[in-house]
Amino acid sequence: MSPIFTCITILCLLAAGSPGEEVAQTPKHLVRGEGQKAKLYCAPIKGHSYVFWYQQVLKNEFKFLISFQNENVFDETGMPKERFSAKCLPNSPCSLEIQATKLEDSAVYFCASSQ
């Protein structure tokens, strides 16, 4: 199979808050081959205690993955736990990790924060 078809592309968006404030999500673009690890980071707006991760597969609606209240998991009903993991540690960016990427993981991953 051609490398083009086995390439996993993960695009990240920035979530906007109030003017001058925004969620910092890194990296902005991430390309991985099948079976490789992918890790994304999200620094919420200062003072926000809730963090949300979403996934949008091409031409589909955003799918909720997981949310945190401070460093505690608040809701993980959408998280595919076999290969995906997420955490929020105090005074550190939150992270979303895919252990062994698959083609169907190609998506936009979006992080948002709220008070």
Curated annotation (Swiss-Prot):
<dbReference type="InterPro" id="IPR007110">
    <property type="entry name" value="Ig-like_dom"/>
</dbReference>
<feature type="signal peptide">
    <location>
        <begin position="1"/>
        <end position="20"/>
    </location>
</feature>
<dbReference type="GO" id="GO:0005886">
    <property type="term" value="C:plasma membrane"/>
</dbReference>
<keyword id="KW-0391">Immunity</keyword>
<keyword id="KW-0472">Membrane</keyword>
<keyword id="KW-1015">Disulfide bond</keyword>
<dbReference type="GO" id="GO:0042101">
    <property type="term" value="C:T cell receptor complex"/>
</dbReference>
<keyword id="KW-1279">T cell receptor</keyword>
<dbReference type="InterPro" id="IPR050413">
    <property type="entry name" value="TCR_beta_variable"/>
</dbReference>
<dbReference type="InterPro" id="IPR036179">
    <property type="entry name" value="Ig-like_dom_sf"/>
</dbReference>
<keyword id="KW-1003">Cell membrane</keyword>
<feature type="disulfide bond">
    <location>
        <begin position="42"/>
        <end position="111"/>
    </location>
</feature>
<keyword id="KW-0393">Immunoglobulin domain</keyword>
<dbReference type="InterPro" id="IPR013783">
    <property type="entry name" value="Ig-like_fold"/>
</dbReference>
<dbReference type="GO" id="GO:0002250">
    <property type="term" value="P:adaptive immune response"/>
</dbReference>
<protein>
    <recommendedName>
        <fullName>T cell receptor beta variable 16</fullName>
    </recommendedName>
</protein>
<comment type="function">
    <text>V region of the variable domain of T cell receptor (TR) beta chain that participates in the antigen recognition. Alpha-beta T cell receptors are antigen specific receptors which are essential to the immune response and are present on the cell surface of T lymphocytes. Recognize peptide-major histocompatibility (MH) (pMH) complexes that are displayed by antigen presenting cells (APC), a prerequisite for efficient T cell adaptive immunity against pathogens.</text>
</comment>
<dbReference type="InterPro" id="IPR013106">
    <property type="entry name" value="Ig_V-set"/>
</dbReference>
<keyword id="KW-0732">Signal</keyword>
<keyword id="KW-1064">Adaptive immunity</keyword>
<dbReference type="GO" id="GO:0007166">
    <property type="term" value="P:cell surface receptor signaling pathway"/>
</dbReference>
<dbReference type="Pfam" id="PF07686">
    <property type="entry name" value="V-set"/>
</dbReference>
<keyword id="KW-0675">Receptor</keyword>
<comment type="subunit">
    <text>Alpha-beta TR is a heterodimer composed of an alpha and beta chain; disulfide-linked. The alpha-beta TR is associated with the transmembrane signaling CD3 coreceptor proteins to form the TR-CD3 (TcR or TCR). The assembly of alpha-beta TR heterodimers with CD3 occurs in the endoplasmic reticulum where a single alpha-beta TR heterodimer associates with one CD3D-CD3E heterodimer, one CD3G-CD3E heterodimer and one CD247 homodimer forming a stable octameric structure. CD3D-CD3E and CD3G-CD3E heterodimers preferentially associate with TR alpha and TR beta chains, respectively.</text>
</comment>
<feature type="domain" description="Ig-like">
    <location>
        <begin position="21"/>
        <end position="115"/>
    </location>
</feature>
